[in-house]
Amino acid sequence: MAAEFKDTIRIGTLVNGGPGTVEYIRQILPHGFESFSITFWKTCLGTDLKKLAEDVRRVLDGTGVVISSVSVFGNPLMDGQEAKDNRESWKRLIDAANLFGTDLVTGFAGRVVDKPIPDSMPVYKKVFGPLAKRAADKGVRLAFENCEMGGTWDKGDWNIAQTPLCWEMMHDALPADNIGLEWEPCHQMVKLIDPMPQLRKWVGRIFHVHGKDATIMWDVIREYGIRGPKQWAFHRTPGFGDSNWTDIISELRRGGFKGCIDIEGWHDPVYRGDLEMTGQVAGLNYLKRCRAAFVPNPKV
């Protein structure tokens, strides 16, 4: 029987949803990940979610490891078959979340393509109003990643949930208690936004954290600016970027966060390819040190 997990924050990683999910989890489980976030790109309609959940939970049985969330990343706010499939994927994941032992479904909020962010708010409300109710009826929460996917305030293809101003507008359009954020510092840092003040302000709405950091090359910015020929920001695995995750986890704890920090790999410019899992396990151990190992108080 697995030892009871005492801490309120787990450290895990993202896993692609599909035919290789179960075997991938089986192989990396010994590294010490405490949670897994199963993610789909655009659609999950080709996956038997019930069977996947059964197979995953069989692998995790007795380990104490959990599925933190199930996710689908696409643009549900547009017309066309791809957007329709993405909306249907949200529905199916909401319905199947409990089979995985989670109450959290995450992804992109979507966007009306190449229109300013405010133009998406009516469509966002129309799409996610029913989805939020469907989720609430099943005890499920929804969370949107704060990823701009190359978009700006004026134009973009994927996601409106980019910055605190966007989150305020989304909340005003659809003030549902079961809608929150899938937050990470990286997506703010690459826009030169300090992530810590927003973390303190929004921690109560953060349902899930992606473990991803950034390195900002200030020497490049000073010499070339942010529109010059040199790249000045890089997505990094935690432990290799600029953030102090001891501070981040302290603020999460102080704000009452109970949930998972799951490493979002496959972005680091150094620890990639053959070094992907080397970097992820280094990030896992770093985040565990920042969290500190739970030690029960003496009972006297």
Can you annotate each of these PLM segments?
Residues 216, 227-236, 258-273:
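Active-site clefts of carbohydrate-active enzymes
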Residues 99-118, 141-153:
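Active-site groove signature of glycoside hydrolases
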Residues 1-104, 118-129, 136, 176, ...:
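N-terminal pre-domain/capping segments
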Residues 65, 102-103, 140, 255-259:
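A short helix->loop->beta-strand "cap" motif at the edges of active sites that frequently abuts
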Residues 14-18, 39-43, 70-75, 110-112, ...:
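Active-site beta-loop-alpha junctions enriched in small/polar residues
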Residues 214, 253-254:
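Catalytic-face loop-and-helix region of soluble metabolic enzyme cores
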Residues 46, 152-161, 270-278:
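Short, flexible/disordered intra-domain loops and linkers
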Residues 7, 26, 35-36, 70, ...:
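Acidic/histidine-rich catalytic cores of soluble enzymes
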